[in-house]
């Protein structure tokens, strides 16, 4: 990099995490960053921000756990089998909530099961995500008017992705996983 005598490059102060217009980190297209990136790209280096690096790693290594309550769990099992192979997207199953980033709630959530769902959700490390799968988990489904059914798991835990259907297909659930990865890329993982 050639600089005129007496001039120095100073990185601008960060103004926030994401630019609302472009969805990219603010400051990634400034002159200082551009010159360093051009200089190092010729030498085989990649210049990025820490937030982008962590977000990239997190989207490619989502560990999920099941909270299968009814027939939607069969489609969830089908998604993890070799035909759809969700692990090629970095979406691997785990048995413990302490090792999981994503919880898939599939099926009818009853009032008696709601505290257990919240307890398992609280045991998951931050950042944690929830996919609500099927009509019963989304809003009570066929049993919506029953006295013992919670009308949607979003009344107990915050839901990030809703997958509609009764039961939704394995392709729909896989599409929901891809939407979750897209959401993580868009929002970042350091501050949520």
Swiss-Prot record:
Its cofactor is [4Fe-4S] cluster. It is an enzyme of class 7 (translocase). GO terms for cellular component: plasma membrane; respiratory chain complex I. Binds 1 [4Fe-4S] cluster. GO terms for molecular function: 4 iron, 4 sulfur cluster binding; iron ion binding; NADH dehydrogenase (ubiquinone) activity; NADH:ubiquinone reductase (non-electrogenic) activity; quinone binding. It holds the Pfam family Oxidored_q6. Keywords: 4Fe-4S, Cell inner membrane, Cell membrane, Iron, Iron-sulfur, Membrane, Metal-binding, NAD, Quinone, Translocase, Transport, Ubiquinone. It catalyses: a quinone + NADH + 5 H(+)(in) = a quinol + NAD(+) + 4 H(+)(out). InterPro entries: NADH_UbQ_OxRdtase-like_20kDa (IPR006137), NADH_UQ_OxRdtase_20Kd_su (IPR006138). The keyword GTP-binding does not apply. GO terms for biological process: aerobic respiration; electron transport coupled proton transport. It is found in: Cell inner membrane. Its EC number is 7.1.1.-. [4Fe-4S] cluster binds at residues 71-72, 136, 166. It is a peripheral membrane protein. The keyword Metal-binding applies. Belongs to the complex I 20 kDa subunit family. NDH-1 shuttles electrons from NADH, via FMN and iron-sulfur (Fe-S) centers, to quinones in the respiratory chain. The immediate electron acceptor for the enzyme in this species is believed to be ubiquinone. Couples the redox reaction to proton translocation (for every two electrons transferred, four hydrogen ions are translocated across the cytoplasmic membrane), and thus conserves the redox energy in a proton gradient. NDH-1 is composed of 14 different subunits. Subunits NuoB, C, D, E, F, and G constitute the peripheral sector of the complex. This is NADH-quinone oxidoreductase subunit B. It comes from Sinorhizobium medicae (strain WSM419) (Ensifer medicae).
